[in-house]
């Protein structure tokens, strides 16, 4: 006897990409609903997910709260494509017998995006493209990366890749993180420091690669940002909430 078809709901597919993936074929025979926007309103989410048997979360934009889960009596599975689950109330899922599955994710895309942002900012690429389109030419000088210091805060899979990119560009790499991060960085031949202040004051480019949890939420404060060089670049391709609320506004104003 074959299993009954499920209703699978996939939110936050902004690029209308999932239907073109090879793995989407595995949902053949099931009813699939894909939403191409992101909403936060509880009533709207409850309506969209009301008869879902499974949610497939391809991003971490939609918060799966206890209040929402109580409105979803049919839901039995939440599948998250990446490893982050800070947006899912795991305890509420456990109470309601909802299984949560997470994927391994890939460090390659976020690492490459991080480096693209570093290059764009240090070489003023967006500004120069805009100027060129308006008839201008080389309106400012870029900043060379070779010989400058790349600070890596968190040496997991993504941080390790970004550190390697920095090395390839001739940068001095300085890693900060927990003991496990420091040991891995040392084994890979990178300098490391357990001193947060040294990282902040030394880095010309500081890249954050931390998981978001209770311990790391708001970890980077306005005081931390105030210790950085006025010419330094902060890159955060991890989670916005790693930085204390309003810190990015307060630090420049404080000088």
Where are these regions (language model features)?
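Phosphate-coordination loops involved in phosphoryl transfer and adenosine-cofactor binding
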Residues: 5, 75, 146-149, 222, ...
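Short beta->alpha connector loops
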Residues: 13-16, 37-40, 59-63, 82-85, ...
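Structural motif corresponding to alpha-helix initiation and N-cap regions
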Residues: 17, 38-45, 61-66, 87, ...
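Short loop/helix-cap segments at secondary-structure boundaries that form the rim of catalytic
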Residues: 20-27, 70, 88-95, 180-188
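Glycine-rich NAD(P)-binding loop of Rossmann-like domains
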Residues: 128-161, 170
């Amino acid at each position: 006897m074959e299993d009954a078809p499920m209703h699978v709901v996939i939110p936050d597919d902004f690029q209308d990409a999932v239907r073109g993936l090879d793995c989407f074929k595995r949902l053949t025979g099931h009813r699939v609903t894909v939403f191409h926007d992101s909403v936060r309103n509880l009533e709207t989410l409850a309506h969209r997910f009301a008869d879902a048997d499974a949610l497939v979360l391809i991003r971490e934009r939609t918060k799966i709260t206890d209040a929402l889960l109580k409105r979803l009596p049919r839901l039995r599975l939440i599948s998250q494509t990446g490893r982050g689950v800070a947006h899912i109330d795991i305890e509420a899922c456990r109470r309601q017998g909802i299984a949560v599955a997470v994927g391994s994710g890939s460090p390659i895309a976020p690492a490459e995006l991080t480096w693209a942002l570093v290059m764009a900012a240090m070489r003023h690429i967006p500004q120069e493209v805009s100027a060129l389109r308006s008839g201008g030419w080389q309106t400012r000088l870029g900043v060379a990366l070779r010989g400058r210091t790349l600070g890596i805060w968190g040496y997991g899979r993504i941080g390790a890749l970004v550190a390697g990119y920095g090395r390839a560009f001739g940068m001095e790499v300085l890693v900060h993180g927990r003991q496990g991060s420091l040991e891995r960085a040392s084994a890979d031949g990178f300098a490391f420091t357990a001193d947060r202040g040294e990282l902040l004051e030394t880095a010309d480019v500081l890249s954050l690669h931390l998981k978001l949890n209770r311990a790391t939420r708001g970890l980077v404060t306005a005081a931390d940002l105030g210790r950085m060089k006025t010419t330094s670049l902060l890159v955060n391709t991890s989670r916005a909430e790693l930085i204390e609320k309003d810190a990015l506004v307060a630090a420049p104003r404080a000088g």
